[in-house]
Amino acid sequence: MGFRAFLVEKTGVGFERSIVERSESDLPEGELLISVKFSSMNYKDGLSATGNPGVTRNYPHTPGIDASGIVLESSHPDFDNGDEVIVIGFDLGMGTPGGFAERIRIPANWAVKCPPGLTLSLIHI
């Protein structure tokens, strides 16, 4: 299935940024496929989006070091399809395509279920 992602690409003279159509086959291996509902912009994402080599070394790249969303596919016993989850840190948005996309695929140990009383949008405030 296709989805949109913010992509930073290295060119001969700098970096280009655009919204592109991606395929789930473009995503890395992982136990959870997540439909991203929210992600926040922070300092590290800004550095990554401008091509800072101290933050991102592999291109093309999708920034976004955090994301919250709904599990679409799970091969891990602790998560079910439909679970609301939060992902912050690890390699997300650094070496692994990040939250500035409509889909991410990650190892299950990067995710936590959204606690009762907290919404996916409030996590990023």
Stretches found by the model and what they are:
Residues 44-46:
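Cytochrome P450 core scaffold surrounding the K-helix E-X-X-R motif
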Residues 17-19, 68-70, 84, 103-105, ...:
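Conserved hydrophobic/aromatic beta-strand scaffold that supports enzyme active sites
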Residues 123-125:
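Conserved small/polar residues in nucleotide/adenosyl-binding loops
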Residues 1-6, 32:
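Short structural boundary motif marking the start of a folded domain
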Residues 25-41, 52-92, 98:
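Glycine-rich beta-strand-centered segment in the early N-terminal region that forms part
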Residues 108-121:
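Glycine/charged-rich beta-loop-alpha catalytic/anionic-binding loops adjacent to active sites
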Residues 93-108:
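A structural motif shared across PLP-dependent enzymes of the aminotransferase-like
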Residues 13-23, 52:
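Short glycine/threonine/proline-enriched tight-turn/helix- or strand-capping micro-motif at secondary-structure
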